[in-house]
């Protein structure tokens, strides 16, 4: 019986110490024709959620420099989400309002 206790305790300890970091969701608010915060830093696997808090205006999130197509427009009280799997710096802007800019930085 004692021969089984130590291996079982060792396995339980190893399982308990190998926690996997849970992916996080970071919120960027769109209001008054601005992305707030304008710059965010996340880890690979994290999600950015853009929330449109305007009263009447639609927006989009476009990673044009990365060669992406423009995301669908989203209207007040709607959201757009994107998961970032690779490290790097990803500038973006609003398609209909190119003066609205932001940057997502992804690093370990």
Regions found by a protein language model. Give the residues of each.
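Extracytoplasmic copper-binding redox domains, predominantly the cupredoxin/blue-copper superfamily
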Residues: 2, 19-108
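Bacterial N-terminal signal peptides
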Residues: 7-16
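Bacterial N-terminal signal peptides that target proteins for export
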Residues: 1-7
């Amino acid at each position: 019986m004692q021969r089984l206790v130590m291996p079982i305790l060792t396995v339980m300890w190893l399982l308990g110490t190998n926690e996997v970091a849970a992916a996080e969701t970071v919120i960027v608010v769109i209001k008054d024709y601005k992305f707030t915060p304008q710059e965010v830093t996340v880890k690979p696997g994290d999600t950015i959620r853009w929330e449109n808090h305007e009263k009447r205006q639609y927006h989009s999130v476009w990673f044009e420099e990365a060669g992406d197509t423009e995301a669908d427009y989203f209207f007040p009280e709607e959201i757009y989400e994107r998961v970032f799997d690779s490290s790097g710096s990803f500038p973006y802007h609003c398609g209909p309002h190119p003066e609205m800019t932001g940057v997502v930085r992804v690093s370990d």
